Every structure is written in C-alpha cells, then in structure tokens.
Amino acid sequence: MAMLSFEKKYRVRGGTLVGGDLFDFWVGPFYVGFFGVTTLFFSVLGTALIIWGASQGPTWNLWQISIAPPDLKYGLGVAPLMEGGLWQIITVCAIGAFVSWALREVEICRKLGMQYHVPIAFSFAILAYVTLVVIRPILMGAWGHGFPYGIFSHLDWVSNVGYQYLHFHYNPAHMLAITFFFTTTLAMSMHGGLILSAANPKKGEPMKTTDHEDTFFRDAVGYSIGSLGIHRLGLFLALSAAFWSAVCIVISGPFWTRGWPEWWGWWLNLPIWSQWPLN
C-alpha cells in the first residue's frame, strides 16, 4: 500500500517502550515495534493451538469446535494438555496478544505526540475478557469457571451461567451494561447519520457545516452536545458498557450466589410500601 503524502514526516525514530530501534520500523502502512512482533507471535501461536486442538477433537464443524477449560477438579492448577491445559495456554496467548496490541498503540501515540485515549479504551475490552477467564475463575477457585473457546459451546456456557442465577437479567450491573451498549449504538448511529447527511447535500449544494449539525439536534431534542462532546460521550458510553459487563459477571458467583431476583428484596422491603401486603 502506497504511503500517503503526509505520512512520511510522522515516521520518526523514538517513542518505543521496549527494544529501542531494533523493531522501530514499518511494513507498508503498519508500524511494527517490539509489541507488534509479540502480537504476531502470540496470535499465530494461539491460532495454531486452536487448530491443533480442533484436530484432536471429534469434528471439524466450525460451529461445534470447542476448546474447553479444565475440569473443576484441577482447581487453579495446571491441567493436562488435553484436559484443559490447551485452554490455559491459548488463554495466555490471547492475553499476550491483546496486551501487546494495546502497548503497540501506546508506542504509536508516543511517536505522534498524542494522548492515550485509544489504548485506554482498548484496555477496557481487555479487562472484560480477563475478568471472564482469569479474575472470576481465580475468585471462584478453579479455571473451569472460564468459558470454552467455541461458537456453540460458548453460547451454551452463557446460557448455563444465566440459569445458575435464575434470571440473569435481574443482575443490576447487567442492566447497566446492556443500557450502555444500546445507548452507545443509539448515540453513535445518530452521530454517524448526522455527519453523513451534512456531508452529502443535494447535487449542486455546498457541504453543510457544524452549525447545521448543531441546529439539527437543537431542533430535534432541544440540545446539541457539540462536535467534540459527542466523541467524549461516545467514549464514555462505550467504556461504561465494557466496565459494567465485567462487573456483572465478576459479582455473579464470587459475591452473589443466589438467584438475582432475590437481590431485589431490599426494594420490596422499603418502608414506603412494605407496610402493604403484596397480595
């Protein structure tokens, strides 16, 4: 891919966290860096192990391939390779690849003199994953509480965990996470739609300005958060969705073992209406 006219002046030495100038180069438009190498290493190794694990299983059906975590009897120990050890190694590779990618983003930000909003945002996605496969299993005392790597098996795991706590959607943190996910979708789709509508006027008319965009939302909902504000809001909504997703699963089991509908007993016992019988 050809280098864009303005890119050359930004391709300067320095800003690396590890490795100095050893990996401080580009391949086409992609910056490599030490953490680019480690990202590639962990990604290739993890993918190869998944393929090898699938070859040892009963099927090549993409929907049914599954790399399962260790049995609960192994606790937090190292399991035999074909009894969950493979899952443990793949998990290490996944975390290594994700963290390496985030650190590579940090190096790119340092080179460009930018702040670290992008790697910080990506770290919230890493947090959600690590919560599922490391933090919650450790708090519950066994790697077997992690989710399997497979399409149908992962969906089964989600369903089973939900039924363990009766109605999982009564989990207050889950409610917040879903609310933030849907609100992120709404806010970003409205923002994208607004930009495209302003940038694509009728033939022969000039492209509209930020004043048109602000006025649209003032006319529509009475307030415009502004061009910079919508990006701040979008970042906040997206990070909140990832954060509360991590919270909703980590409190289920380690800190709350009963059905989630029971958690709402405090609401029914409020003195405002607890004096009246429910029936």
UniProtKB/Swiss-Prot annotation:
Matching Pfam families: Photo_RC
Residue numbers binding a ubiquinone: F217
Membrane topology, as annotated: Multi-pass membrane protein
Protein's cellular compartments: Cell inner membrane
A biological process term (GO) from this entry: response to herbicide
Repeat recorded as keyword: no
Annotated (7R,8Z)-bacteriochlorophyll b binding sites: H154, H174
InterPro entries: Photo_II_D1/D2_sf, Photo_RC_L, Photo_RC_L/M, Photo_RC_L/M_CS
Alphabetical keyword list: Bacteriochlorophyll, Cell inner membrane, Cell membrane, Chlorophyll, Chromophore, Electron transport, Herbicide resistance, Iron, Magnesium, Membrane, Metal-binding, Photosynthesis, Reaction center, Transmembrane, Transmembrane helix, Transport
Segments traversing the membrane: 33-56, 85-113, 116-141, 171-200, 226-252
A GO CC annotation given for this chain: plasma membrane
NCBIfam families found in the cross-reference section: pufL
Protein family per UniProt: Belongs to the reaction center PufL/M/PsbA/D family.
Name this protein carries in UniProt: Reaction center protein L chain
Gene source species: Rubrivivax gelatinosus (Rhodocyclus gelatinosus)
Organism phylogeny: Bacteria, Pseudomonadati, Pseudomonadota, Betaproteobacteria, Burkholderiales
Gene name of this polypeptide: pufL
